[in-house]
Amino acid sequence: MPDTMVTTDVIKSAVQLACRAPSLHNSQPWRWIAEDHTVALFLDKDRVLYATDHSGREALLGCGAVLDHFRVAMAAAGTTANVERFPNPNDPLHLASIDFSPADFVTEGHRLRADAILLRRTDRLPFAEPPDWDLVESQLRTTVTADTVRIDVIADDMRPELAAASKLTESLRLYDSSYHAELFWWTGAFETSEGIPHSSLVSAAESDRVTFGRDFPVVANTDRRPEFGHDRSKVLVLSTYDNERASLLRCGEMLSAVLLDATMAGLATCTLTHITELHASRDLVAALIGQPATPQALVRVGLAPEMEEPPPATPRRPIDEVFHVRAKDHR
């Protein structure tokens, strides 16, 4: 039973903020159902991008990210979210059940972390090297608290090998019609509440200066941040010790935590998952980190120009499409 009564409006507001979480091609593969002052998170299987994400692994990462974002939003509202993961063995889509207890105190850190949800962007442009990296790296390592997830940093002298892994992914998919059709659909020019708008994509010239990004359709002829030259970001790798669904969900939660920590430190980020979508390129990344773990997601972390406008926020689905209240059964 929940220890405190939280109104549906508070839960709904927290879910709306949480839905700023990143997901593959902004597919937002989640559903929330509130009932009796609790809320449940479900995977929306109709929003899994199977041509890209064959096993639904990345959908689980996205759901983990939205779950952590929700906990952050509730903490800023003065409430601790108590999460039970995979509570129903008969329903694999039921990822978490959450009840609530009052927090002792809402700190400035809680508020700033919730603010970081709105400030965070997926920035696909080149970055400058992040300052004070040793301190930042130490902080990011402490952020990854799940026993099933580890964090590593790609050494600078191994960046060519990482670029080769990225190139291998794209070459293996050169004739994959289903993959490219899915990619083009989710980067369409039409105004919508999902997918990646053209304003969030990069030109060919900009893409050439980030040697391990996903190859998206080229929609512009711009060359932003020419003063940065080639990307000098640091690259993090989040890995799991197995491929169990629980580990993937936790990895998504840790991805959220890393992104928010980096944002709070004033740094720009870009999540990369294409390099882990195929076994051949994923194995190359595993060799680079030299650990008995399976890479699930990479994150570029760096510095964007201080006076530059941040990339526009990508759209999100209306809250009433992802959040529902289950009526009480009075029988």
From Swiss-Prot:
Its cofactor is FMN. Induction: A member of the dormancy regulon. Induced in response to reduced oxygen tension (hypoxia), low levels of nitric oxide (NO) and carbon monoxide (CO). It is hoped that this regulon will give insight into the latent, or dormant phase of infection. Induced in C57BL/6 mouse lungs 3 weeks after low dose aerosol infection with H37Rv bacteria. One of its GO terms (molecular function) is oxidoreductase activity. GO terms for cellular component: cytosol; peptidoglycan-based cell wall; plasma membrane. Disulfide bonds: none annotated. It is an enzyme of class 1 (oxidoreductase). Its EC number is 1.-.-.-. It comes from the Bacteria. FMN binds at Q28, P29, W30, R31, W32, R316. Keywords: Flavoprotein, FMN, NAD, NADP, Oxidoreductase. The keyword Oxidoreductase applies. Belongs to the nitroreductase family. This is Putative NAD(P)H nitroreductase acg.
